[in-house]
């Protein structure tokens, strides 16, 4: 079997609520860290989500 080309990364809320999203990323083509503006249901606002490693 071949190795996976994409890795799973966790996008953690910058609001500090502990909410996170899981996304796939190809490390060969996307060298910079992912950052999205998504909805955080705990604060009921759109906030910045930044990439962190899945433990």
UniProtKB/Swiss-Prot annotation:
What would be one Pfam family of this protein? Answer: Ribosomal_L33
Q: Name the Gene Ontology molecular function terms of this record.
A: structural constituent of ribosome
For this protein, the record's InterPro entries field holds: Ribosomal_bL33, Ribosomal_bL33_CS, Ribosomal_bL33_sf, Ribosomal_zn-bd
Alphabetized SUPFAM superfamilies for the sequence:
Zn-binding ribosomal proteins
Q: Which PANTHER family match?
A: 54S RIBOSOMAL PROTEIN L39, MITOCHONDRIAL (PTHR15238), LARGE RIBOSOMAL SUBUNIT PROTEIN BL33M (PTHR15238:SF1)
Which chain regions cross the lipid bilayer?
none
Q: Which UniProt keywords apply?
A: Ribonucleoprotein, Ribosomal protein
Q: What cellular component GO annotations does this protein have?
A: cytoplasm; large ribosomal subunit
Name of the gene = rpmG
Entry's Gene3D superfamilies? Ribosomal protein L33
Gene Ontology terms describing biological process = translation
What protein is this chain from? Large ribosomal subunit protein bL33
Kindly indicate whether the keyword Ribosomal protein belongs to this entry.
Answer: yes
Q: Which NCBIfam families match?
A: PRK00595.1, rpmG_bact
Similarity comment: family membership: Belongs to the bacterial ribosomal protein bL33 family.
């Amino acid at each position: 079997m071949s190795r996976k080309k994409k890795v799973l990364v966790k996008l953690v809320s910058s609001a500090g609520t502990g909410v996170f999203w899981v996304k796939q990323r190809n490390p060969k083509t996307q060298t910079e860290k992912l950052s999205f503006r998504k909805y955080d249901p705990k604060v009921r606002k759109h906030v910045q989500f930044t990439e962190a490693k899945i433990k």
